[in-house]
Amino acid sequence: MSLWVDKYRPCSLGRLDYHKEQAAQLRNLVQCGDFPHLLVYGPSGAGKKTRIMCILRELYGVGVEKLRIEHQTITTPSKKKIEISTIASNYHLEVNPSDAGNSDRVVIQEMLKTVAQSQQLETNSQRDFKVVLLTEVDKLTKDAQHALRRTMEKYMSTCRLILCCNSTSKVIPPIRSRCLAVRVPAPSIEDICHVLSTVCKKEGLNLPSQLAHRLAEKSCRNLRKALLMCEACRVQQYPFTADQEIPETDWEVYLRETANAIVSQQTPQRLLEVRGRLYELLTHCIPPEIIMKGLLSELLHNCDGQLKGEVAQMAAYYEHRLQLGSKAIYHLEAFVAKFMALYKKFMEDGLEGMMF
């Protein structure tokens, strides 16, 4: 039994439910013969990976769906061994180099070199190149990005790159200039409602339009999240009702409780408790950027107009530090400590003003 997001994922460009003009342009790009490097970017849950797999299907046929998971060990110049997991077919290789941390440069160089120098096992694909799909390119170190730029030029004849990321702002200009940029915007509320209704019909379920609209809005235009929430609603209660409760993920509830704990008390003991809660989120693989964004959103509900600006500016500062550093907990805890000091001073000043 598979999740709806996997079970009903379109496998060809002609079956995509939205951005159909873009799908037609991508099909023309594949058929023209001169396939370039691609930089596919857009918000989470917009359908980037689905479109990339559809492009690969258009390039090579059904063979790209015969996937295998491979584990490779790469040795760095300092003799350190790095284990990397990849997903591969006979025609392409998918890897997330940022999993290797500061050694991502070595991973990129070795992976691309291996793929570019190996021959395809099936020769009837009529393509003289393989494709390497690199995910989360915006999380690569600058060294790795410069190495990627050099490698792109070196192996252009036997290898094409498809780079996938949420934002191009952290991708260096030399890479952006060597790729055809493909922006995948988030689907509209109407698009998500249509997809939810279609999936529920295929499952033999009756989804009220009001519930579909609420799911689409609560997902923040993230189609993957909307489908997962819809499936959770199905498990929780069926037949659906227009006003039924939409279940939240555990980490979102936990993050809200953490924000409430910060606002309710500003002491060293409470800061220690919050640090433990932040560790709990990080160990469950919640990205630190998401934690920072969620904390800010919840904390702003407890701030007035003047304080909101200061807190948002402070969050931007520590989020920037978070990107530069390697220990997320330091910057998250520093943000919480700074907020506690600011909020406590604000409340004390407010009380003094009321007394006089």
From Swiss-Prot:
Residues with PTM Phosphoserine: 125
Principal localisation: nucleus
Gene Ontology biological process terms from the UniProt entry: DNA repair; DNA replication; DNA strand elongation involved in DNA replication; DNA synthesis involved in DNA repair; DNA-templated DNA replication; positive regulation of DNA-directed DNA polymerase activity
Keyword check for Nucleus: yes
PTM annotation (N6-acetyllysine): residues: 20
Disulphide-bonded residues: none
Keywords: Acetylation, DNA replication, DNA-binding, Nucleus, Phosphoprotein
Listed GO CC annotations: Ctf18 RFC-like complex; DNA replication factor C complex; nucleoplasm; nucleus
Lineage top rank: taxon: Eukaryota
SMART domains, per the entry: AAA (SM00382)
InterPro entries registered for this protein in UniProt: AAA+_ATPase, DNA_pol3_clamp-load_cplx_C, DNA_Rep/Repair_Clamp_Loader, P-loop_NTPase
Protein location: Nucleus
Record GO terms (molecular function): ATP hydrolysis activity; ATP-dependent activity, acting on DNA; DNA binding; DNA clamp loader activity
Classification via SUPFAM superfamilies: P-loop containing nucleoside triphosphate hydrolases, post-AAA+ oligomerization domain-like
Family: Belongs to the activator 1 small subunits family.
Its job: Subunit of the replication factor C (RFC) complex which acts during elongation of primed DNA templates by DNA polymerases delta and epsilon, and is necessary for ATP-dependent loading of proliferating cell nuclear antigen (PCNA) onto primed DNA.
Subunit structure: Subunit of the RFC complex, an heteropentameric complex consisting of a large subunit RFC1 and four small subunits RFC2, RFC3, RFC4 and RFC5; the RFC complex interacts with PCNA. Forms an heterotetrameric complex with RFC2, RFC4 and RFC5; this complex has ATPase activity but is not stimulated by PCNA. The heterotetramer of subunits RFC2, RFC3, RFC4 and RFC5 interacts with RAD17. Interacts with CNTD1; this interaction facilitates crossover formation.
PANTHER family assigned: REPLICATION FACTOR C / DNA POLYMERASE III GAMMA-TAU SUBUNIT (PTHR11669), REPLICATION FACTOR C SUBUNIT 3 (PTHR11669:SF1)
Protein name per Swiss-Prot or TrEMBL: Replication factor C subunit 3
Protein species of origin: Homo sapiens (Human)
Gene name for this UniProt entry: RFC3
